[in-house]
Amino acid sequence: MAFETLHCMQKQNANTHSYMALKLDMSKAYDHVEWSFLEELMRKMGFNERWINLMMMCLKSVTYSVLVNGEPCGMIHPTRGIRQSDPLSPFLFLLCTEGLNGLIKQAELNGDIHGVSLCRKGLKLTHLLFADDSLLFCRSNLEECDKVLEILNIYEGALGQKVNRSKTVLFFSKSTTTDARAQIKEALGVPEIMHYEKYLGLPSFVGRGKKVSFNYIKERVWRKLQSWEGKLHSQASREVLIKSVIQANLTYTMGCFKIPLGLCHEIEVLIKKFWWGQRGDRRKIHWLKWDEMTKSKMVGGMGFRDLALFNDSLLAKQAFRLLHNQDSLFYKVFKARYFHNSSIMEAAASRMGSYAWKSILKGRDVLLCGAHWKKKLKFGNIIGCQVNILHK
């Protein structure tokens, strides 16, 4: 979602409104959470009064002691904050972000800020929130910049949580003037980014150099293998490390983007060298081809993943989500932009489409290889049903 919105901003025409994206990093200040704010927030969200009282009892029953010469002394009763070791704390902390969500929605309803329009007369996005990472979208002018600052100041004052400005960055659409950029950067006190900044561990922009954008995956695999290289590992332990650590860590990125085949091959080369015990420049004989090792153990292989095929299967899962989860924001955004008059199965590739969309189409092609699909047929007032039967 974030990638698609930033791509839309990057490709906007000069004659449209200019927009900016503010990537916020909220500090995890568990000890700054105001109890009164959390209590009132739960009440506004419609929680039962008995439930609210139970939650507040859990928060207010905490006491602390200070060790003096190894002996606990005193009994401190806190008036704010939530315990980091409490299993409830992460969920209560996430509830607090609903306050920011409400402030942004109210500002949008009042016309104080305007979200990014992803297509003509279509859906507009003002913010995306995930854990302590947030993306805010608005027009790149001082009026809306001041409103965003006001919202953040209200939120910080009520909750006690602070914006980590050292990790907060700005991105502007092409149509934003140089003067407007300078004024907004000065007002917010955060730097501007251009390319290859990450959001939730993934690159926010992917240009023509796909390998450059995703080369961090190979570097991460290489560092992990280097840390294991000096240790003595049996073949069984190497198998476990490859399957449960190296190949499992690739799942997140491969589930969103199509990784270049050359990069997949280079990562597989690193895995092969580790499997056969090669260290540094010392060469080892590879007794079995990689294609054979990716086969199931039932047919003589090792059950390692073919990374290119694994990538395609994960992208097919995203296409399947677009096919069936039609109430999600994920579906609404992509349908409005790419297949508003059809379904994902009939959608055509767009020259101006984002790399995320092109990657999903690769997964869609996998579904088409193993599915029978028929469009809706209309006979008078009778509309036939869609048929999509997986036969493989």
Where do the PLM segments sit?
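A helix-boundary/hinge signal
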Residues: M1-K392
